[in-house]
Amino acid sequence: MRSVLTISASLLFGLALSSVAHANDHKILGVIAMPRNETNDLTLKTPVCRIVKRIQLTADHGDIELSGASVYFKTARSASQSLNVPSSIKEGQTTGWININSDNDNKRCVSKITFSGHTVNSSDMARLKVIGDD
């Protein structure tokens, strides 16, 4: 129960950061607290439906191991797409851009992004920052 509250608090913190803008239309979509045990239902919901063409992932605090990620679009069919994410991200490291909306339909908006993974080499929970580019 405590880890659920911690994850919920982290998601709310991530939503508060979602309006922060960077150069070149890069926006922090949110921050996810990564538990120490493998978890496959870590969800980052976008507060508003947003068209995002690609994302970057940053390990803000601690090392992270990822076993998968998917992006979900707001459509009548609830379309989703599996993402090719690196298996590990070291603290302070940022991935290259990961393309989404690759089916030539750049008008689909992202409703949520889910991750499977956990914190490694740390007694504290790592933070995964998700940066979007529209």
From Swiss-Prot:
Transmembrane segments: none
Ligase in keyword set: no
Keyword annotations: Signal
Cited Pfam families: DUF2541
Signal sequence, start to end: 1-23
HAMAP family (UniProt xref): UPF0412
Family named by the database record: Belongs to the UPF0412 family.
UniProt-listed NCBIfam families: PRK10154.1 (NF007541)
Protein name: UPF0412 protein YaaI
Protein's organism: Salmonella paratyphi B (strain ATCC BAA-1250 / SPB7)
